[in-house]
């Protein structure tokens, strides 16, 4: 890529978006969904190897900046970015500025606890984190639980339980599979309830959903919107959900 862009001399800087990225330090720190452990000084490693100034931030923050500059959040000053992938990432923009907080990790909404008792274990080591229910991997976990607890026929029963993915659930839902549709209802309801709390925190103009799971469309969007509407104060009713 560097060669294709004319070599190192033509590149002014490198920007990296990564899970658990610390903008202040240029480090990836204790990322639960990456094989790297501890604190990784990735920006410094890039600079040492390539001699190019490098900035690093949380991947959801990077997505928020992208949406604010080029996408669904253009013209907005207050919004929340939610990335739905292997985990649940988030970036919070208030008055046109990213919120980083004291230590660079403000807005780890995927690690808010939404099940205090008997919650699923998370890669971070705690139990009941939002991302264990509302990420792509969380959807697969819900599918396995539903298939064990329920007896009705489902297209998902033809797939070995440990191989089920969120895309398998989506494909089954599109074909009218009731159990698959219920999985999305369950997931969307939990996410919508959490988003209602996030709305009360920053009163955003919009919440933008990004990532593979967000592409499930109305299967997940409708229960999200219903749960938000059922759980927020009337003063926040104008908050909108966008899918990027």
Describe these PLM feature segments:
Residues 1-13, 23-27, 43-54, 69-76, ...:
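ATP-binding/phosphotransfer module of carbohydrate and carboxylate kinases, centering on a glycine-rich
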Residues 19-22, 85-87, 213:
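Short glycine-rich anion-binding loops that position phosphate/pyrophosphate groups of nucleotides
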Residues 28-35:
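Short glycine-enriched, charge-decorated loop/helix-capping segments at active-site entrances
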Residues 56-60:
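Short loop/edge segments at beta-strand edges and connector loops
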Residues 64:
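Acidic/histidine-rich catalytic cores of soluble enzymes
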Residues 74-133:
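Glycine-rich phosphate-binding loop of actin/hexokinase-like ATP-binding domains
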């Amino acid at each position: 890529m560097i060669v294709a862009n004319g070599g190192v001399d033509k590149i002014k800087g490198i920007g990296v978006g990564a899970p658990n990225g610390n903008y202040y330090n240029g480090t990836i720190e204790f990322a639960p969904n990456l094989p790297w452990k501890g604190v990784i000084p990735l920006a410094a490693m890039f600079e040492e190897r390539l001699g190019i100034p490098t900035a690093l931030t949380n991947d959801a923050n990077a997505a928020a900046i992208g949406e604010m500059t080029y996408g669904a959040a253009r013209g907005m000053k207050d919004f929340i970015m939610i990335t739905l992938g292997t985990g649940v990432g988030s970036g919070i923009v208030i008055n046109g500025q990213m919120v980083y907080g004291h230590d660079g990790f403000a807005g780890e909404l995927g690690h808010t606890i939404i099940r205090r008792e008997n919650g699923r274990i998370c890669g971070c080591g705690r139990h009941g984190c939002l991302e264990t229910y509302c990420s792509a991997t969380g959807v697969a976990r819900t599918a396995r639980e539903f298939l064990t607890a329920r007896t009705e026929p489902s297209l998902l029963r033809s797939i070995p339980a440990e191989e089920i993915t969120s895309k398998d659930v989506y494909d089954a839902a599109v074909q009218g599979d009731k159990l698959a549709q219920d999985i999305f209802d369950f997931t969307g309801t939990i996410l919508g309830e959490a988003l209602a709390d996030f709305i009360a925190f920053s009163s955003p103009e919009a919440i933008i959903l990004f990532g593979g799971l967000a592409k499930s469309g109305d299967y997940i969007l409708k229960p999200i919107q219903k749960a938000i509407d059922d759980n927020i104060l009337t003063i926040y009713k104008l908050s909108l959900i966008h899918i990027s």
